[in-house]
C-alpha cells in the first residue's frame, strides 16, 4: 500500500469514527462516546504524522471533504456535550437542594411544632 492510500485510509477511518461518535452523542450513549474518544485522539495523532506525498492533489481533495465532515461533526458534538453538561449541572443543583431539605427536616423529625415555634 502506498503512502497516499494509507493516508486516505486513515482519513476514512477518522471520518467514520467521527460519525459514530456523533451518533452515540445523539443517542445519549455518553459512556460509549468517551470510550471512542481515546481511539479518535490516537487516530488524529497518526494522521498528523502521515503527510500526503507531493503530487497527490486528488487524494488531498478527498481528505479535505472528510476533514470538513469531521469538523462539522465536532461542532455538533460540542453543542451536544454542552447541553449534557448543563443538564448534569441542573441535576447536581437539584440534588444539593434536596440534600438541604432532607437535613433541615431531619433535624425537626420527632418534634411537634406549633405555629410560631419554628422562628424561635
UniProtKB/Swiss-Prot annotation:
Residues 59-97 are annotated as: FliD binding. The keyword S-adenosyl-L-methionine does not apply. Keywords: Bacterial flagellum biogenesis, Chaperone, Cytoplasm, Repressor, Transcription, Transcription regulation. It is found in: Cytoplasm, Cytosol. The keyword S-adenosyl-L-methionine does not apply. One of its GO terms (biological process) is protein folding. Coiled coil: none annotated. InterPro entries: FliT. It comes from the Bacteria. The lineage of its organism: Bacteria, Pseudomonadati, Pseudomonadota, Gammaproteobacteria, Enterobacterales. GO terms for cellular component: cytosol. It comes from Enterobacter sp. (strain 638). Residues 1-50 are annotated as: Required for homodimerization. Belongs to the FliT family. This is Flagellar protein FliT. Dual-function protein that regulates the transcription of class 2 flagellar operons and that also acts as an export chaperone for the filament-capping protein FliD. As a transcriptional regulator, acts as an anti-FlhDC factor; it directly binds FlhC, thus inhibiting the binding of the FlhC/FlhD complex to class 2 promoters, resulting in decreased expression of class 2 flagellar operons. As a chaperone, effects FliD transition to the membrane by preventing its premature polymerization, and by directing it to the export apparatus. It holds the Pfam family FliT. Homodimer. Interacts with FliD and FlhC.
Amino acid at each position: 500500500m502506498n503512502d497516499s492510500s494509507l493516508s486516505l485510509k486513515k482519513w476514512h477511518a477518522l471520518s467514520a469514527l467521527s460519525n459514530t461518535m456523533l451518533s452515540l452523542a445523539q443517542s445519549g450513549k455518553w459512556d460509549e462516546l468517551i470510550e471512542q474518544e481515546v481511539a479518535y485522539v490516537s487516530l488524529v495523532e497518526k494522521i498528523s504524522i502521515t503527510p500526503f506525498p507531493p503530487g497527490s492533489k486528488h487524494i488531498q481533495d478527498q481528505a479535505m471533504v472528510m476533514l470538513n465532515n469531521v469538523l462539522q461533526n465536532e461542532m455538533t458534538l460540542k453543542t451536544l456535550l454542552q447541553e449534557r453538561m448543563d443538564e448534569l449541572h441542573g441535576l447536581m443543583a437539584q440534588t444539593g437542594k434536596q440534600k438541604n431539605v432532607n437535613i433541615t427536616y431531619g433535624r425537626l423529625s420527632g418534634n411537634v411544632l406549633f405555629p410560631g415555634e419554628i422562628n424561635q
